[in-house]
């Protein structure tokens, strides 16, 4: 009967790709009827673990670049979901309102995360059209976010954060650096 015998299993990888892979393999081994993955690394782990169990993803900026689906058109795969792609033009307008004197936008991101790379590439193209430049600092792990942000002091006039999973999971470190250095922070996601 519909609505009966539904079992939910919830696991969090806490931003760790190795843990995401373990969780995906566990759900596949449990013969789940459907797997819901939140964030690109988790969705990628599920796609790597199964081609048979349906995957519904969310919080994925570009599922094509992340290699979850071959295109945004119906693909006939077992993978579907919702993109959280940012309207970067509006984000840039907000940056200019928050920090009108700013010329250099600092971003901390994980260069190994497809979502983040897409956003950084788009910012490299868009910011100069608005009289701004991009200053980048890599944070391949959550523990790197604070030191990456500190490396931008004196180089960035404003911080911008996208939907990078490492940055979001270590957000307090970025906020602290911004507050201590009096660098405004514009966030696309918190």
Regions found by a protein language model. Give the residues of each.
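Short hydrophobic alpha-helices and adjacent helix-cap/hinge residues
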Residues: 1-190
């Amino acid at each position: 009967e519909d609505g009966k015998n539904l079992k939910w299993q919830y696991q969090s990888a806490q931003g760790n790709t190795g843990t995401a892979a373990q969780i995906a393999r566990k759900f596949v081994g449990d013969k789940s009827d459907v797997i819901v993955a939140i964030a690109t690394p988790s969705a990628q782990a599920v796609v790597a673990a199964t081609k048979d169990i349906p995957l519904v993803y969310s919080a994925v900026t570009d599922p094509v670049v992340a290699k979850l689906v071959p295109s945004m058109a119906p693909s006939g795969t077992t993978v579907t979901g919702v993109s959280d792609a940012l309207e970067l033009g509006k984000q840039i307008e907000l940056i200019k309102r928050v920090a009108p004197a700013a010329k250099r936008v600092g971003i901390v991101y994980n260069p190994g995360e497809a979502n983040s790379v897409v956003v950084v590439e788009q910012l490299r193209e868009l910011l100069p059209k608005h009289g701004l430049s991009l200053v980048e600092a890599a944070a391949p792990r959550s523990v790197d976010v604070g030191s990456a942000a500190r490396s931008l002091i004196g180089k960035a006039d404003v911080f911008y954060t996208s939907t990078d999973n490492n940055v979001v999971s270590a957000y307090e470190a970025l906020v602290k650096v911004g507050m201590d250095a009096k660098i405004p922070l514009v966030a696309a996601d918190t």
